[in-house]
A protein has these predicted regions:
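Hydrophobic alpha-helical segments and their helix-loop junctions in multi-pass secondary transporters
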Residues: 17-27, 128-132, 136, 140, ...
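Membrane-interface helix-loop-helix modules in multi-pass membrane proteins
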Residues: 35-100, 227, 239, 244-280, ...
Length: 446
């Protein structure tokens, strides 16, 4: 059997297995809150769900490519984004225990009004929209060249099959399959790393000496990731939805564990790129390493991409349906929730037919929402409602500045790739905090 046939078999068989294993949601609590027999997910289940739902196909592709470009420094830099879990876990714990808020939307509506909640909802809807195409494009790339018939066919089939089991159980299906996918991911990653370390010309010494710890060669991205971690998690409903389905203590514990374990997973996956670097490979690190080791490892890498992309997709579908049905109260029954899943699946697939860079779904959207930093970091600070709008608009402006590459070089104090990303975020987040707090003192003076 040819490799391409094995790849199709992996997609079809794994999706069908998940469909038949997924629980059928019959109540709103099961579909939108993953409550089964009045029991919420425990620490182990929630931690696994958090990690795998954030180990996107695009994120592990980026991790491997950064390992290829910058050595282990690139992997560590990208793992910086996983500080997001710790930040969200601690702040949402405080919001739930001290503020008694039951959702992010309730917090925003109570403190800043319905207008702020509407703007926030638009931001996270765009985020969910991005998640669909940016992950399915990675899957398509394993089946054919971008724009080819096999490429499009793989994307459409994969999206439909994932939608099928997501529609069946909603968030219950998502979290249930997350556990299976996390176990699969761990086993497959160990197989890949075991194969790499079994070669005679690669060792841990090669990993340690593979990069240079300088701003120009990876640290720009690392510090940008750390800065964005104080706003990034709050515009990701896949993450925040899971912060309100268990007790505050279980949630905090799970998020802190996910922060550490998720970062380790990303760094380990970047080792694939480090190996590619030592062998002088070019192009997509994961694909090239798979080809170098033969059909079996290529299929293992392909399967790990399918696993991570499916996890992200089903989480995206369930979060979008919850956004419309629960947070925005646009529909009450499960039928509405299932229809909304189909809508985001269709809309999110349309950009596949356009030429869009995968990485842009992470870095640019991350910059555009830095205005959320003071909103959540200073969640208990009394400020007028205008503070929310000023900070969010300020963040969007800096995001646009980054997109068009018009940020003054005189305000960048490091060089190399991602220098603009770092310094736009540094100056942007300082501006957002200042502009968020200023109205507080103006109102007091009056």
């Amino acid at each position: 059997m040819e490799t391409i046939h094995w790849q199709w078999t992996l997609i079809l068989v794994s999706s069908l297995i998940l469909f038949f294993l997924s629980p059928l949601a019959k109540t709103r609590d099961q579909f939108f809150k993953a409550v089964s027999n009045r029991k919420a997910p425990n620490t182990l289940v929630l931690t696994g769900s958090l990690i795998i739902s954030w180990i996107f196909a695009k994120s592990i592709t980026n991790a491997a490519n950064l390992g290829l470009d910058y050595g282990i420094v690139g992997g560590v830099a990208y793992a910086g984004y996983y500080l997001s879990f710790a930040v969200a876990g601690i702040l949402i714990y405080q919001m739930r225990t001290k503020g008694r808020f039951k959702s992010i939307h309730e917090f925003l509506t109570t403190k800043f009004g319905k207008g702020a909640m509407a703007i926030f909802s638009i931001l996270i809807a765009i985020r969910l929209f991005n998640e669909v195409w940016s992950n399915t494009m990675v899957i398509g790339s394993y089946f054919g060249e971008s724009g080819s018939q096999p490429y499009y066919l793989a994307i459409i089939v994969f999206t439909v099959l994932t939608l099928a089991y997501a529609v069946k159980g909603g968030l219950s299906s998502s979290i249930f399959t997350d556990v299976i996918q996390m176990v699969l991911f761990s086993v497959l990653l160990m197989i890949i790393l075991g194969t790499i370390f079994s070669t005679e010309d690669f060792s841990t010494t090669d990993i340690v000496t593979s990069g240079t710890w300088s701003f120009e060669l990876g640290l720009n991205l690392f510090f940008a990731a750390i800065i964005q971690s104080f706003s990034y998690p709050f515009h990701d409903p896949v993450l925040t939805d899971r912060a309100f389905i268990t007790s505050p203590k279980v949630t905090r514990r799970s998020f802190l564990l996910a922060s550490i374990l998720g970062a380790i997973c990303i760094i380990l996956f970047s080792v694939i790129g480090v190996y590619a670097q030592t062998q002088g490979m070019k192009g997509q690190a994961a694909v090239e390493v798979g080809k170098a080791f033969g059909v079996i490892i290529l299929l293992v890498i392909n399967f790990i991409m399918i696993t991570s992309a499916a996890s992200t997709l089903d989480s995206t579908f369930s979060s979008f349906s919850k956004l419309l049905a629960v947070d925005l109260k646009m529909g009450k029954d499960l039928t509405f929730g299932r229809i909304s899943m189909a809508i985001i699946a269709i809309l999110g697939t349309l950009p596949v037919f356009l030429d869009v860079e995968i990485l842009s779904a992470t870095t640019i959207s991350g910059t555009m929402v830095i205005g959320l930093t003071p909103v959540f970091v200073f969640w208990n600070m009394k400020v007028p409602r205008i503070s929310f709008y000023l900070s969010v608009i300020c963040g969007l402006v800096f995001g646009v500045v980054l997109v068009f590459g018009v940020f003054p070089e005189s305000l960048m104090f490091t060089e190399g790739k991602y220098a603009d990303l770092l310094w736009v975020n540094v100056w942007g987040i300082l501006s957002c905090i200042i502009i968020y707090i200023i109205p507080k003192f103006i109102v007091i003076k009056r």
